[in-house]
Amino acid sequence: MKIRNSLKSLKDRHRDNRVIRRRGRTYVINKTNRRFKARQG
């Protein structure tokens, strides 16, 4: 999982990326290609 300040560019790298908020943190997850995981931090 990558930790980035801005998730907007990571969201646009794959069409299945989703931006999810869990426990006050923002994540990018991808069900079909799991290497596109990232957390905002």
UniProtKB/Swiss-Prot annotation:
Is the keyword Disulfide bond assigned to this protein? no
Does the keyword Ribosomal protein belong to this entry?
yes
Q: Which residues form the signal peptide?
A: none
Any one GO molecular function term: structural constituent of ribosome
Q: So which domain of life are we looking at?
A: Bacteria
A biological process from GO: translation
Gene Ontology cellular component annotations, sorted alphabetically: ribonucleoprotein complex; ribosome
Task: Keywords in alphabetical order, please.
Answer: Ribonucleoprotein, Ribosomal protein
Q: Which family does it belong to?
A: Belongs to the bacterial ribosomal protein bL36 family.
Q: Which NCBIfam families match?
A: PRK00831.1, rpmJ_bact
The protein's name = Large ribosomal subunit protein bL36
- From which source organism is this entry? Rhizorhabdus wittichii (strain DSM 6014 / CCUG 31198 / JCM 15750 / NBRC 105917 / EY 4224 / RW1) (Sphingomonas wittichii)
